[in-house]
Design a protein with these regions (language model features):
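Glycine-rich active-site loop/strand segments that organize a redox cofactor
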Residues: 62-98
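Glycine- and aromatic-enriched mobile tails/lids
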Residues: 2-8, 12-14, 36, 47-49, ...
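An anion/pyrophosphate-binding glycine-rich loop and adjacent beta-alpha core
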Residues: 230, 236-352, 408, 414
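Glycine-rich FAD pyrophosphate-binding loop
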Residues: 35-56
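N-terminal Rossmann-like FAD-binding beta1-loop-alpha1 element of flavoenzymes
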Residues: 17-42
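Glycine-rich loop(s) and the adjacent beta-strand/alpha-helix scaffold that form part
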Residues: 198-255, 395, 399-408
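Core beta-strand elements of the Rossmann-like FAD/NAD(P) dinucleotide-binding domain
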Residues: 12-15, 184-195, 378
Length: 565
């Protein structure tokens, strides 16, 4: 047993609005709730200064700016969302949580000390991913996350760093609070709140990584579905959980950079030096991400690999800007490319398809807690924002939608006259469950357990899937249930990893079940059913909603979505 356990304390905490997850969406939610005059508590598994998907920085913000062209308007943007994220994006929600909040989000970014402009004072915009015009504002967001952390501290938000949330509790069907523990000291927290915003991102480490290391991923490896699982167990409805997302990355280095490359005009070519994306989408290298991945997979499957990012036609100034931008998300990516022999001039950079992850099928929606126009779930008092929700993704939605979630959570909290009770017996049971892996002298390590989950997911639905592969995955994943009670941990760090592994396991089952129920292919290859290879708008243009009922049964339904065309 870890030596710190003998000093473990139990803390009782009360607040108006609790924010679970201190990434971009969570911190913007906290700003809004504090601005509304609520007591705000931020709980983060890491440290809010550098945590979440943009912990290392970010270089793009999607926005329409109303500069004059027909594509640069609210209406054109929503039309674009409807085309590119058809069947996954609820335009009514987007209109409320993004469009209504966009101007304020842009102003807030500048106000906290991060300029969206280039050194010459101009806004530089690029076009990629199926956009009708250059919606990407290219900027230096290296210090955006620390600046947001400073802002929530300035607004007097209470912060609990290094606390992993373990479960959510209701009282008479409404939020009562949640539990968690300090991943360093083992202190246990019982937290009561009038409202909570869940902003803990998507689920990673579910599939085999491109380079073998499950922590060297395109996306944040600390996002392990912790609150997707906890919310699901509390009866919160989830949506868009069936999608398996991938991107194009440098061979040997999973890193962001897709839109930087294509926004600057780079193009994908096969080993015959042929640009191939024109064969898969009319916009060629400006196509939506899923088409780019689909095209790359087909070229590799048909023997025309490896694939390359062709930058030979870019001008010296464009290359200089590109390599600077690539270092904003991950400092070492430019160094890696140069060390591999890719000179800045005349570069032909070998690329590949990244590892899959359970996440949104488009930059224009999310995957997770089903939200309405108020960012509210089906459970009173529980709200969601960012990648943890079914309608938000990327910086633009995390900034705008995160703030919207905080506003609505605060408005709800102000109507609640008293905190709801946490059941004493349930608290004791949860504390015992959380620390039980530390008491086991022998058993399974988190690495062994998690690796088995990854193998099953990769083999059965990462990304090609059929009814047989999905039912087989569920059978194998269900057989792992008994092994959950055998996980052991030798210290607090391993305890955290054990709970992450357990959450990844549960989310993998949720994802497989949702994919099984969607008997069509959509956003190829993110939901590619080899037994149903066509998109079926007549029957499946909508959100696959999955929910655990009070009796423990898991149910699904399709919430149909309507679009102008």
């Amino acid at each position: 047993m870890d030596g710190a356990m003998s000093d473990r304390k139990v803390h009782e905490v009360e607040t108006d609005v609790a924010i679970i997850g201190g990434g971009t969406a969570g911190l913007n939610s906290a700003m809004a709730a504090a601005e509304a005059g609520c007591r705000v508590l931020i709980v983060d598994k890491a440290n809010i200064v550098h945590s979440g998907a943009i912990a290392g920085g970010i270089d793009h913000f999607v926005a329409y700016l109303g500069t004059g062209p027909s594509w640069d308007t609210r209406e054109a943007y929503l039309g674009y969302v409807g085309r590119v994220a058809r069947g996954a994006a609820d335009l009514d929600v987007h209109d409320a949580v993004y469009c209504d909040e966009l101007d304020a989000a842009l102003a807030r970014t500048e106000k906290i000390g991060v300029s969206l402009r280039q050194p010459d004072g101009k806004i530089f915009r690029t076009q990629a991913m199926g956009q009708p015009g250059p919606y990407f504002i290219n900027f230096d967001g290296k210090h955006l996350k620390p600046k947001m952390a400073m802002e929530v501290k300035r607004r007097k938000c209470e912060i609990l760093n290094r606390v992993q949330v373990t479960n959510i509790y209701l009282h008479d069907g409404e939020l009562a609070g949640f539990t968690g523990y300090d991943i360093r000291t083992g202190d246990f927290y019982r937290i009561r709140a009038k409202a909570v915003v869940i902003a803990t991102g998507n689920t990673n480490r579910m599939f085999n990584a491109q380079i073998g290391n499950p922590f060297n991923l395109w996306y944040c490896p600390a996002n392990t579905g912790d609150l997707h699982r906890a919310a699901f167990d509390a009866g919160v409805a989830l949506a868009n959980m069936e999608y398996v997302r991938m991107t194009i990355v440098p061979k040997g280095f999973s890193a962001p950079g897709f839109n930087a490359f294509f926004g600057m005009g780079a193009r994908l070519v096969n080993s015959l030096r042929e640009p191939f994306m024109k064969n898969y989408h009319e916009m060629a290298d400006k196509a939506p991400r899923n088409f780019m991945v689909w095209g790359a997979l087909q070229e590799l499957k048909e023997g025309r690999g490896p694939i390359y990012m062709d930058c030979r036609h870019l001008k010296p100034k464009e290359l200089e800007h590109l390599f600077f931008t690539l270092g904003i998300d991950k400092d070492t990516l430019p160094e890696f490319l140069l060390a591999k022999g890719y000179a800045k001039e005349g570069a032909m950079i070998e690329m590949t398809v990244s590892e899959p992850m359970q996440a949104r099928p488009s930059e224009l929606c999310g995957s997770g807690i089903r939200i309405d126009r108020n960012c509210a779930s089906n459970v009173p008092g529980i709200y969601a924002a960012g990648d943890a929700s079914d309608q938000m993704g990327c910086l633009h939605m995390a900034m705008a939608g995160g703030f919207a979630a905080g506003k609505h959570a605060a408005a709800y909290a102000k109507k609640i006259t008293h905190l709801r009770p946490l059941d004493t017996h349930a608290m004791a049971e949860e504390e015992a469950r959380v620390f039980r892996p530390l008491e086991r002298r022998s058993g399974i390590t988190y690495r062994e357990f998690e690796n088995i989950v990854r193998i099953i997911c990769t083999d059965h639905f990462g990304p090609v899937k059929t009814e047989l592969s999905l039912t087989g995955a569920l059978e194998k994943l269900n057989r792992l249930d008994t092994a959950r009670d055998e996980l052991k941990a030798d210290n607090m760090h391993e305890l955290m990893r054990a709970h992450e592994a357990l959450n990844i396991h549960q989310v993998s089952k949720i994802s497989a079940r949702a994919a099984l129920e969607r008997r069509e292919s959509r956003f190829h290859p993110y939901q590619y059913r080899a037994d149903f290879p066509q998109t079926d708008d007549a029957n499946y243009c909508g959100l696959m909603v999955i929910q655990k009922q009070p009796d423990g049964a898991v149910t699904t339904r399709l919430d149909k979505l309507k679009y102008a065309a």
